[in-house]
Amino acid sequence: MKKYITLLLLLLSCTVSMAQIAVGIRLNNPLVYGSSISPLYNEDGKKFNTYGNWGVFNSGVFARIPLKEKHWVLHTELLYKNEGTHLSGFDVPDKDRGPYYRESLYEEKRHFSLQYIDAPCLLQWEGKRMFRGYLEAGFSLKFLTHASYTNGWFNAPDENVTPHFNRLVLTGQVGGGVLWDIKRVMITADMRMSWNLTPITGHLVRGVDFSESMGFSLSLISIGVGYKLGYKKK
């Protein structure tokens, strides 16, 4: 095992430019961040109407590691991320519905919220000017910390449903942005979208079937501010 670890560290030292590693903080604009989980079905197989979960603040830290190959950068993050979805439908089995049930029943409103620690690892391709653009793509592991369910119509309190969801989810991520490289400091602004590659659960949760669903999130503006380690004034 020690030999494998030593070999891995040696390979990294051959491909990473240590002098330009930057670490910093990253946060999104909650007004232009949204997530959704769909499609969702009830126990009869009827599809719920789903709506995006907007206006959520996410933040965390990042490390940006230029590779010795020109234009390529390894970008890693550790973020708090909130995802969820709103849904509505008639949660009454078909056998219990009368011919005019839509006139006598209220449409039930629900909300699922999932909180993750998100750890993306992205490969970036960038220009070389002080103010430059970049593209990025990669994968992420999301670690579930808490999941809650709310039946909004009856003003019920949030219910902890964490045990019903998978603790670990793999996602794909793509995006792009611009970077301002100012001596010791770099500032980034980007947009990014991600989607689940593995299921968030494999069974019904409070009468909602997630078996065919896919989680999706979109952040139109996120800002990062980083500090270069080992920077030497030229």
Residue ranges and their predicted role:
Residues 36-38, 164-234:
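Predominantly the C-terminal beta-signal and adjacent terminal strand-loop region
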Residues 35-44, 86-93, 147-156, 200-208:
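Outer-membrane beta-barrel translocator domains and adjoining extracellular loop/strand segments
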Residues 23-27, 76-78, 121, 135-137, ...:
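Membrane-embedded beta-strand positions of outer-membrane beta-barrel proteins
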